[in-house]
């Protein structure tokens, strides 16, 4: 990977920083692992906006990624590393010894031609997936399950990872990048290593149109709206918020905690750092 600063030949290119990935596959993705993806522009089945600032963007297919990694004992060869428009991380196309192909989240350092393995007997090597009970304490892992057999949910985006801190009984403690320490069942699976594309956060888009290609629409400030549209709206001329910052639905924002999942509260050993 290389970080390239583009020459300022136009206002839209001034300040653009690109991440060049010469190792990525330049052809088409595996057709058998593609699914159509309908664009909903942030609307639900009633047509109501459920996620703001979404719409447009380039059309693309969904790549079916294997987050369970439950095909044990069969070695798989990495055929290539690909770009995935649906996520920040890169994906790897692997082919098992029995001929089955699948996509996995590519860990940092994984290259075409290498071999990955799933199961309790897999060696501790980047890209291999094991139950947490078989992973040494102190290891850096990613694609961690929260429930056995449910599939990876933690540390799936570019450059992320968690650290296995300890094991006590049927639970292990992992420390997330946010600083949160969480209990996870030792039968949950995790993949060794760190997620690829760790320089993703260094990219600078340079112009609004580059974000529109991704399906991201403009974000309008509340103080620039009318009172009917936002609690911060209204006033003569330029005015401030006039109150504690709130969301469009009058919920306190900028630091106010909204987590209300009491069912899994016991699995959090230490809350994340602010």
UniProtKB/Swiss-Prot annotation:
InterPro entries given in the database record: NA-bd_OB-fold, Rib_uL2_dom2, Ribosomal_uL2, Ribosomal_uL2_bac/org-type, Ribosomal_uL2_C, Ribosomal_uL2_CS, Ribosomal_uL2_dom3, Ribosomal_uL2_RNA-bd_dom
A molecular function GO annotation: structural constituent of ribosome
Biased composition (Basic and acidic residues): 229-239
Superkingdom assignment: Bacteria
PROSITE patterns: RIBOSOMAL_L2 (PS00467)
Region Disordered, annotated ranges: 224-254
Gene Ontology biological process: cytoplasmic translation
GO annotation, cellular component aspect: large ribosomal subunit
Keywords: Ribonucleoprotein, Ribosomal protein, RNA-binding, rRNA-binding
The UniProt record lists the keyword rRNA-binding: yes
Keyword Amino-acid biosynthesis attached: no
Similarity-based family: Belongs to the universal ribosomal protein uL2 family.
Assembly information from the UniProt record: Part of the 50S ribosomal subunit. Forms a bridge to the 30S subunit in the 70S ribosome.
Function: One of the primary rRNA binding proteins. Required for association of the 30S and 50S subunits to form the 70S ribosome, for tRNA binding and peptide bond formation. It has been suggested to have peptidyltransferase activity; this is somewhat controversial. Makes several contacts with the 16S rRNA in the 70S ribosome.
Name of the molecule in the record: Large ribosomal subunit protein uL2
Organism field: Leptothrix cholodnii (strain ATCC 51168 / LMG 8142 / SP-6) (Leptothrix discophora (strain SP-6))
